[in-house]
């Protein structure tokens, strides 16, 4: 009996009707190779289950009891595309290689269900704009806990737990960047904390808007399982006329938060034990200098922020 299937890959649909129930999963993959150029060993077919597990290559399609025109999502990259992605452009040692960050990033970043979740956030999440985006400015997205202040230590006031040089850092950044606060907590908590730290009332800079945990999405990764992330695509989808991957940088002390946008994320050292480290922490001073250096660039997505200190030392040594 002939099977009719629809394979979804790369934003396209590929109808298949030349396979029979006696053909195997591997036969299906070889048919897809001729259509897409993706090698069978590079493919993942989502939704093909046998006895509760992903169907192995030798499983016959007939035992999977596929309904006519069943839609199957395929993941995989053409060999030439992989070579292109993995080969760093010449004469630029600051260009990021996604595979250095994490091999699963490529899969997570482009997975269709994750992009669909972002689209829903773009459509449904309500942003309260505190100050309108400014033409020609880049975008700086900042985490709160352990990035701007130590939220675990005890103190009489929030000022005691504030990261050193916070207001100087934000004042300097505001010259070149619109500033967005994004915390994995509730908006009520974010507003209270920003007010307590004097961030939303400072005359030297303005916050464009703030995002809470409701703007985040959950993604599945092979290595980490389910994780919550902060997809910058939510901001780009809502304010695409101002912000994109080319002019956005995000600071967070948790690297997985920018799993969907690794090329835009900078993992900041966490600020903890404020009473012990208040006089020693100079992270925001150095990062202020880094932001000033890269503000001159047309495309921030080509930088590897993992090596920001090396980049800064190199620039300052010139």
UniProtKB/Swiss-Prot annotation:
Annotated function: Dephosphorylates 26S nuclear proteasomes, thereby decreasing their proteolytic activity. Recruited to the 19S regulatory particle of the 26S proteasome where it dephosphorylates 19S component psmc2 which impairs psmc2 ATPase activity and disrupts 26S proteasome assembly. Has also been reported to stimulate the proteolytic activity of the 26S proteasome.
Signal keyword on record: no
Organism: Xenopus laevis
Intracellular or extracellular location(s): Nucleus
Domain notes: The Ubiquitin-like domain mediates interaction with proteasomes.
Record's keyword annotation contains Transmembrane: no
Entry cofactors: Mg(2+)
InterPro entries: FCP1_dom, HAD-like_sf, HAD-SF_hydro_IIID, HAD_sf, Ubiquitin-like_dom, Ubiquitin-like_domsf, UBLCP1
GO cellular component: nucleus
GO biological process: regulation of proteasome assembly
Positions contributing to Mg(2+) binding: 143, 145, 253
Keywords associated with the record: Hydrolase, Magnesium, Metal-binding, Nucleus, Protein phosphatase
Protein EC: 3.1.3.16
PROSITE patterns: FCP1 (PS50969), UBIQUITIN_2 (PS50053)
Enzyme class, UniProt record, top EC level: hydrolase
SUPFAM superfamilies given in the database record: HAD-like, Ubiquitin-like
Pfam families: NIF, ubiquitin
Name of the protein described by the UniProt record: Ubiquitin-like domain-containing CTD phosphatase 1
Residues annotated as domain Ubiquitin-like: 3-81
Domain FCP1 homology: 133-294
Gene Ontology molecular function, alphabetical: metal ion binding; protein serine/threonine phosphatase activity
Domain of life: Eukaryota
UniProt-listed Gene3D superfamilies: HAD superfamily/HAD-like, Phosphatidylinositol 3-kinase Catalytic Subunit, Chain A, domain 1
Catalysed reactions, as listed in the record: O-phospho-L-seryl-[protein] + H2O = L-seryl-[protein] + phosphate; O-phospho-L-threonyl-[protein] + H2O = L-threonyl-[protein] + phosphate
